[in-house]
């Protein structure tokens, strides 16, 4: 199913709209798990001249000018300390089907990217950003985890380069993915993807996990807030 999602995303990048309001995030703690190969394939498929390389933490200020006239932005690393300078607002605007993105280039006149001019977004990271992440971001995120480290004896040297000769086949798979996306009306999301996204939400908000797992709503019963707070603090310590 992860492969289906990837092919749907590649097909989505061929559309001049953002009707499916999604961005790709490839996550894996190890640096040897295949994330970079996927990014290399995306870059090679769309061509360097059509790809920008802003990291999510650069989604503010005059650096946004780099997104102009690009099909896709590929960020190879995300700051684990969080994003709090307007980057997430710009991310939401970029994946929105209707919002324009205001660009203020250095020493040039400001302008706006129309919805059809905005690139699709793909990121990868060994860490998950925690600060200021909210449900609006999670709702738009296609989270694919790479949880298996590839040992040296199993690595295929120059694997990314081999895909250069397979662009025709990749295009066919992307078009099939796009057809599936349009037919379904949404991206394929495996149960693993859904579970990992829920776990990510819990990491961002431990209180969310505590409320879900330990509290039961009962209109006929009242529990002192101090008692609940004590339970929560004890839960956090454990």
Tell me the role of every PLM-derived stretch:
Residues 1-238:
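Feature primarily recognizes SF3-like P-loop helicase cores of small DNA viruses
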